[in-house]
Amino acid sequence: MNYLIMFSLALLLVIGVESGRDGYIVDSKNCVYHCYPPCDGLCKKNGAKSGSCGFLVPSGLACWCNDLPENVPIKDPSDDCHKR
C-alpha cells in the first residue's frame, strides 16, 4: 500500500514538470534572429539551456534554441516574417 502511494506521488510530480521546446527563436513579428550576436547567449538570456546557429530556408542562418520556455515565441512555419 505504501509503495502505491509513493508511486502515485512520484507520478504526479513527473507529470507536473514543465518541459521546454526547441526551435528558432523569433521576435514579435515572427522574424528569426540571425546568428549575430552569438546564439548561445541570446537563447540563454531567454531561458533556454543552449543555442546554436542553424540554417532555415528561406531565412538563412538563424538562432536555434534548445529547451526554450513556453512563453518565448518560436518560428511559426505557416506565418511569414512581418517586417513592415
From Swiss-Prot:
Signal peptide: 1-19
Disulfide bonds: 31-81, 35-53, 39-63, 43-65
One Pfam match: Toxin_3
UniProt tissue specificity: Expressed by the venom gland.
Keyword Kinase: no
Subcellular location: Secreted
Protein name: Toxin Aah4
Phylogenetic placement of the source organism: Eukaryota, Metazoa, Ecdysozoa, Arthropoda, Chelicerata
